[in-house]
C-alpha cells in the first residue's frame, strides 16, 4: 500500500485518510472487532505474552495500518509530522476502535527517520505519541 502526503493529510493508495495533520489524529477505522491483551504467567513459567484477536474485518484493518507504516517513506515526511530521530508511530486504544477490554497498543516503525536508530522508542516521551481518532 503506497502512502501519499499532502499539506493536510497522509492518504493510502485507495484514498483512505490515515493521518489528518490538522487534528494530529491517526485514523483506525474498522467495522470489525479487534482486542489486545497481555497475559502474564500463562504457562506458570513466569513468561508473559501479548494476544491480538479479531474478526476478519478487524484483523484486515490492523494489517492495512501495519502495511501503511511499513510502506511509508519516513525520510520524505515533514519534520513536523515525524521529527528526525523518531519513527512514525501511534497508539490504538479502546476509544479508537479496539474492544473496551483492550490495553493500549503502540505501533510504529523501529527505524528512526534520519538516524535509523533502532532504539529511539526506548527513550521516547510517550506523551508525544500521536493520539488516534475514529474516522468519520
Functional labels for PLM-detected ranges:
Residues 1-136:
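Positively charged, low-complexity terminal tracts
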Amino acid at each position: 500500500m503506497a502512502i501519499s502526503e499532502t499539506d493536510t493529510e497522509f492518504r493510502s493508495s485507495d484514498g483512505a485518510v490515515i493521518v489528518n495533520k490538522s487534528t494530529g489524529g491517526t485514523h483506525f477505522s474498522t467495522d470489525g472487532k479487534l482486542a489486545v491483551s497481555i497475559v502474564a504467567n500463562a504457562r506458570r513459567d513466569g513468561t508473559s505474552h501479548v494476544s491480538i484477536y479479531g474478526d476478519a474485518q478487524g484483523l484486515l484493518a490492523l494489517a492495512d495500518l501495519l502495511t501503511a507504516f511499513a510502506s511509508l517513506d519516513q525520510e520524505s515526511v515533514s519534520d513536523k509530522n515525524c521529527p528526525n530521530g523518531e519513527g512514525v508511530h501511534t497508539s490504538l486504544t479502546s476509544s479508537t476502535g479496539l474492544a473496551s477490554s483492550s490495553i493500549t497498543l503502540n505501533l510504529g516503525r523501529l527505524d528512526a527517520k534520519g538516524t535509523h536508530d533502532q532504539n529511539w522508542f526506548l527513550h521516547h516521551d510517550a506523551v508525544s505519541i500521536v493520539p488516534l481518532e475514529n474516522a468519520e
